[in-house]
């Protein structure tokens, strides 16, 4: 574990840490289309949630796991988070604004009483990490805002949305209210992943 960062996890294609490997920092995720992950190393301050294609979810704390195939034979999604959090809402952001580059805008998501996460349009998923709530299936409200990255940094959307973790099936869902900005849409991609799109400015 000496070469593994405290906030880093490494997933491997073969058992006993062999074959191709991928490094994950806390707040990131890996979507494995082939289902071919067989072992992993988890940093001291990390927690890794892994879903199998059959819906099974397993959490791994800091340590080495040379063979995960008995519990997760066909890995689907790998989510790396800080150890003090329970789950992550994985969000990617894009836009449909004509004449603008894919990465012209920035989405900020701020969960209630937590630090915000900034997500540039056109990129991969970023994790909005959520602690365990009481009760565990409580909703948490998140403030969202979208602005252009270039000067003058004009704001084009402001609003809020609710997310909820369901322990019985280890999935994250969302609920829109009147606070959701009308020029945006959100689509649920999988058990923890969502795409937010800025439709117009």
Swiss-Prot record:
Entry keyword Signal: no
A GO BP annotation: calcium-dependent cell-cell adhesion via plasma membrane cell adhesion molecules
Database matches in InterPro entries: CAD_C_sf (IPR038423), Dictyostelium_CAD (IPR052885), Membrane-bd (IPR029283)
Induction of synthesis: Expression is controlled by rpkA.
PANTHER family according to UniProt: CALCIUM-DEPENDENT CELL ADHESION MOLECULE 1-RELATED (PTHR38083:SF1)
Similarity-based family: Belongs to the Dictyostelium CAD family.
Protein name: Putative calcium-dependent cell adhesion molecule 2
Organism of this sequence: Dictyostelium discoideum (Social amoeba)
